[in-house]
Amino acid sequence: MKVLVKQLMSKSLFTINLDTTLDVALKSLNANSIHRLPVVDNDGNLKGIITDRDLRLATDSPFLPENNEDRLEKLRLHKVSSIMKQNPVTIEDFSPVVEAAKLMRVTNVGGLPVLDKKGRLIGMVTRSDLLDLLIKVLEPVPPQS
């Protein structure tokens, strides 16, 4: 069974701009129940990725106040470009899903931005997507009566 990334990826894509502040990024992650956000420039080109873990590390800094409201205020002062991972690992839409799984395993990331042949960001494929496919493939089909 050969499944391509484009068949599995999520096309409902939430992105943020380089100039987005960290508090807005955190709110976007929480509001959309996602763990990573591709960071794009004004032309929609992928420039980086920011994860909920990146934001947790930024807010757990000993240099930030203990009070949550004060922490959020500090996050308002910084842009995602200051902590995003630049040049994230990506995969092309016509790649086999098994390649995405191997790439995630080797690079220890939970999701990959998906690019088309022209290098445009068109989706995301995540560990959850891979697990959903695995369940679908391995789950026994109930006998038909």
Curated annotation (Swiss-Prot):
SUPFAM superfamilies per record: CBS-domain pair
Record carries keyword Repeat: yes
Highest taxon, organism lineage: Eukaryota
SMART domains: CBS (SM00116)
Keywords recorded for this protein, A-Z: CBS domain, Repeat
Domain CBS: 9-66, 84-141
Pfam families: CBS (PF00571)
Name under which the protein is recorded: CBS domain-containing protein DDB_G0289609
